[in-house]
């Protein structure tokens, strides 16, 4: 008869110590760490200023990890949607794998933004300019460019089709001595004192090196760990299976995966 003994979970204090070690290795390219960095609106604003090459860009509102609904089809949780002072909207996505940054996913994100930005009865021409920005770990498009701008054109004339929809791919492997390259370096940097941007460095230092920031990160990791248990991801009849599942969850947390991604792993 199979042993159905359930392995006792490690204590909260033990997990917090493990979390603290993992937090040291987080970068802004990690999903969990990114959304905590971007809770400081100045960080979102700086990233957009560099990518858009606009020092005058001012973020006046943003939402993080919001579930954008499609009542007739698939919804999606968007990492960050920011609004600037000129009523432009920017969806910033950090993508560690190429399959999370496919052209058709970018197209779908554009559609979700449109569906959620146009109120009933409003004219179509009141749709704002939208920018879907994928910051990718690898060269997702394969053009060996630091940044690729995608916009519809009229084939016969090469004129831009003025629908107000823009897609940008930013290749974070390109870390040359330009403002964009230095930003990409910072997104991959684990240590605040080695970052170029004072804005990003201050926020990373706060989250990694202050008691308040570390506790905030530990609490979030614990919430994700508990969500994993509640979803059944960590349940197993064999103690060995349960131990392996817990180790897997902690490893996925270290990679910066969200609760939703861990549940699907």
Question: Model segments located where?
Answer:
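Short, well-ordered beta-strand micro-motif
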Residues: 134, 169-171
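Low-complexity, glycine/alanine/valine/leucine- and proline-rich hydrophobic stretches
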Residues: 154-163, 171-173, 183, 187-190
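Accessory alpha/beta interaction modules
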Residues: 1-163, 176, 231
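Short, charged alpha-helical interaction segments and adjacent helix-coil junctions
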Residues: 2-24, 28, 32, 90-95, ...
């Amino acid at each position: 008869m199979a042993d159905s003994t359930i392995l006792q979970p490690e204590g909260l204090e033990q997990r917090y110590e493990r979390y603290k070690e993992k937090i040291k290795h987080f970068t802004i390219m990690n999903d969990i760490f990114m959304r905590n960095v971007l809770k400081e609106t100045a960080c979102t604003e700086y990233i957009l200023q560099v990518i858009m090459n606009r020092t005058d860009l001012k973020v006046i509102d943003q939402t993080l990890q919001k579930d954008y609904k499609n009542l007739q089809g698939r919804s999606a949780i968007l990492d960050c949607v920011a609004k600037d002072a000129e009523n432009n909207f920017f969806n910033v996505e950090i993508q560690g794998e190429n399959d999370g940054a496919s052209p058709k996913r970018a197209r779908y994100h554009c559609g979700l933004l449109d569906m959620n930005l146009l109120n009933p009865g409003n004219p179509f021409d009141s749709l704002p300019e939208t920018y879907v920005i994928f910051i990718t770990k690898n060269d997702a498009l394969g053009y060996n460019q630091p940044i690729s701008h995608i916009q519809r054109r009229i084939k016969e004339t090469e004129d831009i089709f003025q629908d107000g929809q823009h897609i940008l791919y930013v290749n974070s492997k390109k870390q040359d001595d330009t403002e964009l390259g230095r930003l990409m370096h910072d997104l991959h940097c684990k240590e605040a004192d080695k970052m170029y941007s004072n804005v990003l460095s201050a926020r990373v230092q706060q989250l990694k090196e202050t008691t308040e920031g570390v506790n905030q990160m530990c609490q979030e990791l614990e919430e994700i760990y508990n969500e994993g248990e509640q979803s059944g991801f960590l349940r197993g009849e064999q103690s060995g299976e349960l131990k392996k599942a817990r180790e897997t969850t902690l490893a996925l947390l270290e990679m910066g995966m969200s609760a939703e991604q861990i549940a699907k792993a």
